[in-house]
């Protein structure tokens, strides 16, 4: 099978897998349960047409510029379109357009769709953080959910015992998770491979068990509830404001609507993800980012270049853990309740699957994989087969596309005859 045909089939399948859960499946409330409704014929035809168009485009995209060039009477390089899309100005405008669409979209979408999108953004931030450790530094971390729990409980405890708000506790949660990453790094980062993975797995379980057994502080299995939501310049989005505060709808003189709270959570999550992407991309261009990549490729060569592998690993663990702390703090604010059972090994496995499925080191791959994984998780009608579908998907990916959906583009040279 030719490379173009493989690429076309994979792209068409990806369009179907992403489009059908978003456009085809609908949720209907029946009593206290949610029912999943299938797609109608028109939606199925639309998805099929989009998949067919993607298949044709990927199959003939290298030949189309040449045909167009001959038709109008001048020579066009087959890589011209690719070069145009790779121009910095083109990429900047494309990214700006996507950001604008992302900010405007929740005002026209349903509440359920916005809520799921917010959950996707949480996993995107977790994937970005773990991508530093696994994708860039090449360290297998199976206990990343422990830092996620530290961030969530930091905000919950600060709100419960000190009355801190979300915006005050957010940086503290990130720093606390980074501190735990730093403390974990010293005793374990001299380990490699499977030994490092086992120790990090134990760390995640230790954190969860401690949170469950420290009943007087953390509430034990019942967790901590009544965690306040984020505010907008001191305006709360609840129906009634606490003493000394004012509600959003009263300040602007509009009717109360619960959708305002959902949209605010989405916007806050989107801002955190955009900030995380900006920081990661800056770090990747700095010496510390180059050191992570050198460590991933060859630790012995990294040491030969004068770099201290322990310090490089420690920086990756610390910075990666801070992003989990930010995500955990926002998760606590969104849920309003945190319990130890929210931070099991399954969460670590899902975050790691997002990084591997998307392509280790690839930011766009993490975003796409988070969308696919969360949508798969939300398919309640297939709940019994969810883990089976998840396992089959990972097996197919390892066989067919082991580098991930959107692998990281690394600088390289090609010698052509």
From Swiss-Prot:
The chain crosses the membrane at residues 12-32, 36-56, 94-114, 119-139, 147-167, 169-189, 260-280, 311-331, 351-371, 387-407. The keyword Protein biosynthesis does not apply. Pfam families: BPD_transp_2 (PF02653), DUF3382 (PF11862). It is a multi-pass membrane protein. GO terms for molecular function: branched-chain amino acid transmembrane transporter activity. Keywords: Amino-acid transport, Cell inner membrane, Cell membrane, Membrane, Transmembrane, Transmembrane helix, Transport. Signal peptide: none annotated. Disulfide bonds: none annotated. GO terms for biological process: branched-chain amino acid transport; D-alanine transmembrane transport. GO terms for cellular component: plasma membrane. It is found in: Cell inner membrane. The keyword Cell inner membrane applies. Component of the high affinity leucine, isoleucine, valine, transport system (LIV-I), which is operative without Na(+) and is specific for alanine and threonine, in addition to branched-chain amino acids. Belongs to the binding-protein-dependent transport system permease family. LivHM subfamily. PANTHER family: HIGH-AFFINITY BRANCHED-CHAIN AMINO ACID TRANSPORT SYSTEM PERMEASE (PTHR30482), HIGH-AFFINITY BRANCHED-CHAIN AMINO ACID TRANSPORT SYSTEM PERMEASE PROTEIN LIVM (PTHR30482:SF20). This is High-affinity branched-chain amino acid transport system permease protein BraE. The gene is braE.
